[in-house]
């Protein structure tokens, strides 16, 4: 494993641990403990709009910060789901990795060496998604 991969894993684990602490029934944050899937939706939407605004402004420092806020929302949903026995953060990561491999056979499946245009990729994506 590379140093970058290790650093990333440690960072993600730290974020997951922080979320678990925030939601700890005995010592967590009262506000975070009251939240559920429905109550955090407005915050998810707000953070997504803030990210879009930062992108429109090409403010890369702000983009980085807003991406962190969006990632935190994902971690928040995952923690709630884990507490309810529905799914985990790891399930989310595994699911999106599998989906991306499935939707990009031109990259991840054996190919005959033919190049694929962006338009063909989009058409295949819609076929596979459908």
Please name every model-derived segment.
Residues 1-66, 72-130:
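Flexible "arm" and connector segments at domain edges
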């Amino acid at each position: 494993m590379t140093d970058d991969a290790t650093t990333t894993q440690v960072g993600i684990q730290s974020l997951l641990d922080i979320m678990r602490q925030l939601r700890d029934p005995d010592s967590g944050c009262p506000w975070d403990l009251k939240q559920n899937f429905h109550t955090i939706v407005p915050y998810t939407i707000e953070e997504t709009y803030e990210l879009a605004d930062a992108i429109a402004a090409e403010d890369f420092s702000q983009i980085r910060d807003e991406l962190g806020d969006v990632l935190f929302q994902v971690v928040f949903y995952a923690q709630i789901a884990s507490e309810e026995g529905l799914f985990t953060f790891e399930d989310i990561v595994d699911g999106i990795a599998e989906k991306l491999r499935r939707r990009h056979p031109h990259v991840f499946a054996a190919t005959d060496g033919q190049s694929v245009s962006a338009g063909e990729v989009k058409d295949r994506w819609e076929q596979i998604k459908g």
